[in-house]
Amino acid sequence: MLFTGGPSTELSLSSELLRDIASADEICIIVSFLRLSGLRLLLDALREFCSDPRHRLRIITTTYCGITEARALEQLAQLERTEVRISYDTRIERLHAKAYLFLRDSGYSTAYIGSSNLSHSAHTDGLEWNVRATQVENPQ
C-alpha cells in the first residue's frame, strides 16, 4: 500500500503506525530527523509497547542539519527497553534513510519505507511517499 500524505488523504502514516505498534513484538525505526512533534503522535502507544518486558524498541537517527530535537531523544531515553543510536557524523556519512519495521513472532511483520521522518507534518499532512510491505504479501 502506498501512502502519499497531504490534507486530502484519508489514511495518515501515523494512524497506520499506531495500529502496527499495538501488535508488534519488536520495533525498529531509522529516520534522519526525529522531532518532538512527530514523536508525540506515537509516544503514548510506544510507552505502552515498551512497558511489556517481551518488547523492544530500537531507533537510529542523526544530528545531520541539527534538525533532530534533544527533547525528543530525552523522551525516548525514558522509555523502558529502548535503544537509541545517534549518528553524529555530518561530514562523511549522511544518514538519510527512513524506515519503520514492526517485527512479529508470528511471522506477520510489516515495514514502512519511504520519505517520512518522524515529524508531525511527515506523518499527517505533508506530501510524502511511503510504501507498506508485509511479510505475508512479500514472503521473501
Language-model regions, residue ranges each:
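PLD/PLD-like phosphodiesterase catalytic module centered on the HKD motif
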Residues: 1-140
